[in-house]
């Protein structure tokens, strides 16, 4: 129906069609995880996902140290996206897999998962984006809270780990905060980009112009446009408002989904992670288990990144590893990883 309507109004294009394919890849991965006997081992699924995050983080660290690959913003500024083209995609993917590593460590008490988390934390920070800086800090803080203050039915922290975490909070965490602030102040591009931190948050990571243009475009929609979207015409009309040389998204997933695909399709796409988030919140308050705790953090970060920086609902890379969380949530009573 979307394609037919967009063909009628002249809004159908390979670009919008590929966006739909990328999103539907999520359902393909979910179906594969749930239906294929090869993925019946939860340990195998979790380890494979975490290994991807570790390898991606090592690539970022290697590229940063030896100054190869793509710069995050420009070649002269802090940050690298290694050999990955989409900085936000790989950044959010590593953040989600870092959360998975934290969960796996507390579930199994296998120190290899903790080491994986530390590697991914370092790799994510070297991307140099606001999302990676604050996302990593949020994950580490959530880990510290879970160790020091939370009471889980299936996990209890050792006294040794609590002492290490306290030392980490007072020494390493302060060092990282000071280091990040220093990097931003000394880097000409980042210092301009994050000159007013509150303004950055209020303007949705500098996307205020993109959002304004998209809202103006959607404001002119008729009833059918609202239902089925305008496809590439949505991007073209944004381009006119922005005076850009090419069609442009708002880079805020809910707005882009509604603009290109309409509210009907967007509702079903946006609904699943939001439904799982509330389900995990309810489950956590009911049973206080470790999977619900980390799933809430992962889903909150995914949805927050979708609204703040985009590249979540529309990224096949991110969606593939979000599917791992959905897979674990749907099988929470059967999980036995090592």
Where are these regions (language model features)?
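Aromatic-anchored transmembrane helix interface
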Residues: 1-3, 7, 11-37, 50-53
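Transmembrane signal-anchor hairpin modules in multi-pass inner-membrane enzymes, especially those
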Residues: 1-4, 44-47, 104-111, 154-157, ...
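Alpha-helical transmembrane segments of multi-pass inner-membrane proteins
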Residues: 46-71, 85-150
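Hydrophobic alpha-helical membrane-interfacial segments at the cytosolic entry of transmembrane helices
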Residues: 51-59, 155-179
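Long extracytoplasmic/lumenal interhelical loops at the membrane interface
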Residues: 70-74, 78-81, 198-261
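Transmembrane alpha-helices of multi-pass inner-membrane enzymes
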Residues: 97-99, 140-141, 294-305, 310-338
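Hydrophobic transmembrane alpha-helices and their immediate junctions
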Residues: 111-114, 260-303, 331
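Flexible juxtamembrane loops connecting transmembrane helices in multi-pass membrane enzymes
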Residues: 159-163, 175-213, 235-240
